[in-house]
Amino acid sequence: WFNDLKQQCRAEMISIIDVTCQAIKHANTTRVGLLATTATVKARIYQDNLITDNIDCYTPDDADQHQVMESIYAYKSGDIAGAYSLLSPVKDRLLQAGVEKIILGCTELPLILEQEVRTSPQHYVDATEELIKKTVEWYFTHNTRNNIAA
């Protein structure tokens, strides 16, 4: 649906899915895990994009996906420690299964796993961060005024 919308829109649009998958591809990663909302996982928007580049995308089983959602809800309700205790084992199982990187495909997930992202950044791709980087790059590429400092 994104590409259809993009074709009908005059404004430049950047896809969070595309920029995240490009980051995975440029890292020469072939096995990734996906932590995201159930709707995102079931829609297969990351998986279908990655498969075109022969990148295997692993998702949590139903029980673990339920824990991901409970973790997100816990974080939103202010239970940071509870959110971490729910999400950390799911993340560990993906890494133990041999994924090279984990896509953090929901804005709360990098916050819940903040310590791990900071200490082991090689294991994570934060979709929101990838979108921000691409947006800033786009701005400076398309900015005609040379006097704006970053």
UniProtKB/Swiss-Prot annotation:
InterPro entries per record: Asp/Glu/hydantoin_racemase, Asp/Glu_race, Asp/Glu_racemase_AS_2, Asp_race
Entry keywords, A to Z: Isomerase
Transmembrane regions listed in the UniProt entry: none
Matches recorded under Gene3D superfamilies: 3.40.50.1860
GO MF annotation: an example: amino-acid racemase activity
Annotated disulfide bonds: none
Keyword Cell membrane: no
Keyword Translocase: no
Sequence similarity: Belongs to the aspartate/glutamate racemases family.
Identification of the protein by name: Uncharacterized protein in pnlA 3'region
